């Protein structure tokens, strides 16, 4: 791996750690916001806020790139919105929308700890989906997936009981997030990441708005009470974190990306501790395992073996 490629990989990994931190801390805002308004309303408003935030950012980046490259640019970057960008945005936006909705309904039936574990099972589903797409997965990444999965079990699962309808919904949520990661990996190689994120949330906003007017009652007072939660989830989680994911995945293997994003569960636990929830020995052990898995996924094992043989 060249120095430039290595630095890009490390920087992209850092961006995903930041995204995971934002997602983990968003659980607090999300929980408080959903005590005031419905699932569709919350998702619609945070998605619209993300669109408002991302539109000027994406326009600024697009105009700067056009000045730097010139009018002779061809391909997907020639126009602000292309057919391929719309297709990618629709696919990403649809999966993000339904994954978020299914997650919220799943939490209603299952405990928070079990919900966190089942949702982050996408780290196991991503390499499995990769097999069906005929992608080679390095053995070390499989080991990392196993370690991280065990770590999240110790970190999140504290309740006892059998499989519930909530568990089934959360497994579906994990699958949808895994699909979204693979879709991003497919399109981000040739599309601008910020614009892809913009279209993604525009689509999510439209879908959730339809559900909001069909299934829920819009209460302006309740929306006002949830304003800070909506702002935090809309700008930081949707606008910034999901965009960091899209941009970072351009330089990362999707399995490695999913492992880093699983840090979300660790930061969620730490955020809970900050707000008065104490970490148990099992949760601390789980945090340690997830960190080990992520660090191990970044180690160039092949290079170390070559050096040792020399």
Region spans (language model):
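Juxtamembrane helix-entry segments on the extracytoplasmic side of multipass membrane proteins
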Residues: 8-13, 36-44, 80-85, 142, ...
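C-terminal transmembrane-helix exit sites in multi-pass transporters
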Residues: 53, 57-58, 122-143, 266-285
């Amino acid at each position: 791996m060249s120095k430039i490629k290595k630095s890009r990989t490390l920087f992209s990994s850092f961006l995903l750690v930041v995204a995971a931190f934002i997602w983990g801390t968003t659980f607090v805002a999300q929980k408080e916001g959903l005590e005031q308004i419905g699932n569709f309303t919350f998702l619609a408003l945070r998605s619209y806020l993300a669109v408002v935030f991302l539109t000027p950012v994406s326009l600024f980046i697009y105009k700067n790139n056009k000045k730097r490259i010139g009018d002779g640019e061809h391909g997907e970057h020639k126009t602000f919105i292309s057919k391929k960008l719309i297709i990618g945005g629709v696919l990403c936006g649809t999966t993000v929308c339904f994954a978020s909705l299914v997650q919220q309904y799943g939490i209603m039936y299952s405990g928070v700890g079990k919900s966190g574990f089942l949702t982050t099972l996408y780290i196991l589903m991503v390499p499995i989906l990769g097999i069906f797409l005929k992608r080679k997965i390095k053995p070390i990444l499989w080991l990392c997936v196993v370690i991280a999965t065990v770590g999240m079990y110790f970190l999140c699962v504290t309740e006892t009981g059998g499989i519930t309808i909530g568990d089934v919904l959360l497994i579906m949520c994990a699958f949808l997030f895994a699909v979204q990661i693979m879709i991003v990996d497919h399109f981000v190689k040739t599309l601008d990441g910020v614009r892809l994120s913009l279209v993604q949330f525009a689509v999510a906003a439209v879908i959730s708005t339809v559900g909001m007017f069909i299934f829920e009652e819009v209460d302006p007072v309740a929306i006002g009470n949830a304003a800070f939660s909506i702002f935090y989830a809309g700008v930081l989680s949707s606008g910034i974190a999901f965009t960091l994911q899209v941009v970072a995945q351009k330089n990362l293997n999707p399995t490695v990306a999913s492992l880093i994003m699983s840090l979300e569960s660790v930061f969620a636990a730490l955020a809970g501790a900050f707000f008065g929830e104490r970490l148990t020995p099992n949760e601390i052990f789980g945090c340690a395992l997830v960190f080990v898995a992520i660090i191990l996924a970044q180690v160039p094992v092949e290079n170390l073996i070559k050096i040792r043989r020399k």
